[in-house]
């Protein structure tokens, strides 16, 4: 990677991996539609390139968290249907209609605002009712769905295109809560039907639901983390072999030998036990490398694992290099990805940081440039 004139910390995203993941997920899906969820800047991978690659590979819809994220995709020429999965304020109704976005709807106030703007602009607002079947997050209770459905049916510029829910434990095989949520979802569908509302697109399955719960596929499945090649949870026998799309790299900035008894970084949490070879890397928690990985994680240099020593600082961190490894300034370092016969995954780092792989990749900050390979389908 040519980084002349740049700080040598970067991420590489393989768009062919994204395409392969989309095709693999579509092969096992029973639903006629697949939504690629690209919220949070495409889970840290880059929303526009990931969305483009996903659509090229056969994704039918895109999902985002906010109106602003949807507008960004539209500004880059993406014309596929986009559903805003998160909260939308009534004040955003004009942008929703102007950009042709679909929105999650769970209160009448937003419906009225969309109808007013739709009438003014001469456009229809398409909404997907969100049902809270057990996440306790946004959404209507199943018993409330019929009431709102009847209210929306009286509006002249709002179409109830879809109805959806979100599964809380789909990544836990055998957990009966998923079945309970689907039963509640079916009850909500019955409430809507009784109100004379029959949305064309029913959807409930996330990445884990897509891979483990075919009974949740309905008319569309949604996938985000699996699109970028990461398993929804560790320790599960997933039926699809996913291709991780992201590799995170830096370069050695300094190499030195420190005598026994030398402390490293803030708080002196690591002290050399003997004469040790220490490399300083130009990457830190401001780049998204979690401080919680201090004295826990490893990196790859010349295909060997090197432990992080001392506290990860804002812009730099230190690693201990094996005595027999001839490391030089400028050597490539892999933080996430493969090098030689070794691999460090986002899932591995998540386990060490007491979090999930989603947070690791979403946390890679915007000051880390992304470079894209496989840009031609």
UniProtKB/Swiss-Prot annotation:
Protein name in UniProt: Alanine racemase
N6-(pyridoxal phosphate)lysine: residues carrying this PTM: 39
Gene (UniProt): alr
InterPro entries according to UniProt: Ala_racemase, Ala_racemase/Decarboxylase_C, Ala_racemase_C, Ala_racemase_N, Ala_racemase_pyridoxalP-BS, PLP-binding_barrel
Any single GO CC term annotated in Swiss-Prot or TrEMBL for this entry: cytosol
Protein species of origin: Symbiobacterium thermophilum (strain DSM 24528 / JCM 14929 / IAM 14863 / T)
Active site (UniProt): 39 (proton acceptor), 266 (proton acceptor)
Reactions catalysed: L-alanine = D-alanine
Keyword Magnesium: no
Alphabetical keyword list: Isomerase, Pyridoxal phosphate
UniProt function note: Catalyzes the interconversion of L-alanine and D-alanine. May also act on other amino acids.
A GO biological process held by the record: D-alanine biosynthetic process
């Amino acid at each position: 990677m040519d980084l002349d004139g740049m700080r040598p910390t970067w991420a590489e995203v393989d768009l062919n991996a994204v395409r392969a993941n989309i095709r693999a997920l579509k092969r096992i899906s029973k639903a006629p539609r697949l939504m690629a969820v690209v919220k949070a800047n495409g889970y840290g991978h880059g929303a526009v390139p990931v969305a483009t690659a996903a659509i090229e590979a056969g994704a039918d819809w895109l999902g985002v968290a906010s109106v602003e994220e949807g507008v960004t995709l539209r500004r880059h020429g993406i014309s596929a249907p986009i559903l805003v999965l998160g909260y939308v304020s009534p004040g955003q109704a004009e942008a929703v209609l102007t950009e042709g976005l679909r929105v999650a709807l769970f209160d009448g106030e937003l419906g009225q605002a969309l109808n007013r703007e739709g009438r003014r602009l001469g456009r229809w607002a398409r909404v997907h009712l969100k049902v809270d079947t057990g996440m306790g997050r946004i959404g209507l209770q199943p018993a409330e769905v019929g009431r709102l459905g009847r209210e929306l049916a009286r509006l002249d510029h709002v179409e109830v295109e879809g109805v959806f829910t979100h599964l809380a434990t789909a990544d836990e095989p055998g957990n009966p809560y998923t079945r309970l949520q689907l039963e509640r979802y079916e009850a909500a569908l019955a409430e809507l039907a009784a109100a004379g509302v029959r949305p064309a697109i029913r959807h409930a399955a996330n990445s884990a639901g897509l891979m483990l719960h075919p009974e949740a596929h309905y008319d569309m499945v949604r996938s985000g983390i699996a699109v970028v090649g990461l398993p929804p949870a560790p320790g599960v026998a997933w039926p699809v072999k996913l291709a991780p799309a992201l590799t995170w790299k830096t370069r050695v900035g300094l190499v030195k030998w420190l005598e026994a008894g030398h402390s490293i970084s803030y708080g002196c949490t690591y002290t050399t036990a003997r004469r040790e070879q220490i490399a300083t890397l130009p990457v830190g928690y401001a780049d998204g490398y979690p401080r919680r990985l201090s004295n826990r994680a490893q990196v790859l240099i010349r295909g060997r694992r090197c432990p992080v020593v001392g506290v990860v600082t804002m812009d730099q961190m230190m690693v201990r290099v094996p005595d027999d490894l001839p490391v030089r300034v400028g050597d490539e370092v892999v933080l996430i990805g493969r090098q030689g016969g070794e691999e460090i995954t986002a899932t591995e780092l998540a386990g060490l940081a007491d979090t999930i792989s989603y947070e690791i990749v979403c946390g890679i900050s915007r000051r880390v440039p992304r470079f894209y390979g496989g840009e031609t389908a």
